[in-house]
Amino acid sequence: MGEDVRRIASQSRPRPSTWAVSRPRPASWRNSRGARPESWRVSRQSFREWIEHWEFEHENRDQILELGHELEHVPDLTVDVTPPATSDGPADSIEKSKEDGDADDKRQSASDSTVKGKAKAVDIGKQQTRDAPYSVHSVGRRRLIVLAASLAGFFSPLSASIYYPALPVIAHNFHVSNSQINLTVTTYLIIQGIAPMITAGFSDTAGRRPAYAICFIVYLAANLGLALQNDYAALMVLRCLQSAGSSGAIALANGVVSDIVTPQERGSFIAFASLGSILGPTLSPVIGGLITQYLDWHWIFWFLLIFTGTFCVPFFLFFPETCRKVVGDGSIVPPPINRSLTDYLRKRKRVKSGTEANQPATKRQKMVIPNPLSTLQVFAVKQTAMILIPSGIAFGTFYAVLTGASNTFKVIYGFNQLKVSLMYIPLGVGGIASALSTGKLVDRNFRRHAEKLGITVTRNKRQDLSDFPLERARLEVGLPLFYLGTACLVIYGWILEKQYSVWGPIILMLVMSWTLAAFFQVMNVLLVDTYPGRGATVTAAVNLVRCELGAAAAAVISPMTDGVGEGWAYTIVAMIGFATTPLLLFTAVNGIRWRREAAEKEKIKKAGREAKIEAEKRAREEIETKKEAKQKAEEDVEIGDLEKQDRKDSQRPTSSKAT
């Protein structure tokens, strides 16, 4: 490791005119070489403070910062830090550089660092990232975190479909047409696609917990208003507010997965993260039908209010902050606004035991105004767009079946509203089956490709996957499932057309739910792989495409079945989905090259941002220098005036005596 650190230091550019540090020399620095030491023996935490607050100017500064973070988790480790030759200590050398202004000293390169100890040496870069734990949470704890995030995303699709059975009753109570009451469904889906664009970018910078808090506060308030209102205009406005609050949590589930799970095991976790959004549309009509059958339709929203409140209490007490920009791998104590009860207990326990609490994040994140344009930028990336289009079409296919089932089973098989609601159970069973099976298939295929390439897959460790065929590994699982789902859709349509036994559609609905839901999950895994660290943002883009295409499919399926019949209507929908699959094949072939090109572009952008920051810093330093020079000149003038006045005052008594 020492050789790698020295190599990085040797690549550094000249030291700036002043070394910036935000605190004096830590007390844990110990002089081990006499009055003029060549190095100091420091603790792990002091080493991190040193590399964090001395502003190294070289391209590998982020790697050194990351090294300091990882050293905190290596036991029995000490660090020898070699300071500048003229230094009496880190803080002393800083002050000396400011006072002397020695040109040679200002150009001196950043100090070398060597690391020694009982810990196994690792390389900076690929080796270092491979050996570093990706998350401090155990496997069981990570599963609970993802399950909680999935349940939080369950409320949006639940609220979208739960009052479908009550639409005729609500229209009769408000004395409006069916078209007007259906407008509340359309507006809900539109807001459901837009709201995550705002919350996703906010959560990627400020943290997941503040974003969840805002979403659920809005959602609870909207449910309370909907349970109490009896006006069509209020229903329309509050449904939009309900959609904005609940749908914001959809994108956060995959963001949580990207925070704590590596690509090697991401398939299983994202399958569970998608479970809530899959079960919502399938189970909610059953719940809504039962409530409408035996209670007043207002109780739909009372049920949502009580259910959500019961969920939120343990969720906000124990759900930890996972955003890597705030807590890193989970070992850093987050700011107060991001802390759960367990964070407070952990910090209190560490203080009582005499252990210093974990350091705050390397750079405390500022609360930023949510920018929906950051989500729209996802569509500008070609590989992402080629994945989003087939994924959205597949979701539209699923919604076409979901929406058309209500009227189809009522007209063809003569079912009442309660029986129609029970027909959605096979869709829910298929969704559960996909969550239990898809992740294992995805992870197994990942390991198969890794074995072919001679790569050892390690759990909860970062690995360099720049040359790994991620697209091929994911799509080899997803595409066959999608083909099977579209084939079942064609058969489903013609069975309804010929009015065969109801058991045929029931079985096909279960298979379609399993295959299409599994395809959604595979696409989610691939998209999160494409945008590491921005899982919430890319999921918001996915949600936008799916909701809008789902709304379109829900709107056109009824006219299509009335015009050409169920057989040709669902055949056309299946053919549209099948026609988009060449985009995925093209992505599988060119995915590695596209990721490399994207990484190079990001590197250039990062260099440009750093150059801009450096230019702004130098400009501020010049302004401060001019300001200090001007202030000094004014002080000199003022001192000169005072000296003249003193001389005049001293001459006045002499003149009086002479007189």
From Swiss-Prot:
GO molecular function terms listed in the Swiss-Prot or TrEMBL record: transmembrane transporter activity
Record keywords: Glycoprotein, Membrane, Transmembrane, Transmembrane helix, Transport
Domain of life: Eukaryota
Transmembrane spans: 144-164, 183-203, 210-230, 235-257, 269-289, 299-319, 385-405, 422-442, 475-495, 502-522, 549-569, 572-592
Residue ranges with Basic and acidic residues bias: 93-109, 605-634, 641-651
Stretches for region Disordered: 1-42, 76-127, 605-659
Localisation per UniProt entry: Membrane
Keyword Transmembrane helix: yes
CDD domains linked: MFS_Tpo1_MDR_like
Tagged with keyword Cell cycle: no
Glycosylation sites: N182, N338
InterPro entries per the UniProt record, alphabetical: MFS, MFS_dom, MFS_trans_sf
A Pfam family recorded for this sequence: MFS_1
Gene3D superfamilies: MFS general substrate transporter like domains (1.20.1250.20)
Entry's Gene Ontology cellular component terms: plasma membrane
Application of this enzyme or protein: Phomoidrides A and B (also known as CP-225,917 and CP-263,114) are potent inhibitors of Ras farnesyltransferase and squalene synthase. CP-225,917 and CP-263,114 inhibit Ras farnesyl transferase from rat brain with IC(50) values of 6 uM and 20 uoM, respectively. CP-225,917 inhibits squalene synthase with an IC(50) value of 43 uM and CP-263,114 with an IC(50) of 160 uM.
Membrane topology: Multi-pass membrane protein
Chain's role: MFS-type transporter; part of the gene cluster that mediates the biosynthesis of the antihypercholesterolemic agents phomoidrides which are dimeric anhydrides.
Family the entry assigns: Belongs to the major facilitator superfamily.
Protein name: MFS-type transporter phiD
Species in which this protein is naturally found: Fungal sp. (strain ATCC 74256)
Source species taxonomy: Eukaryota, Fungi
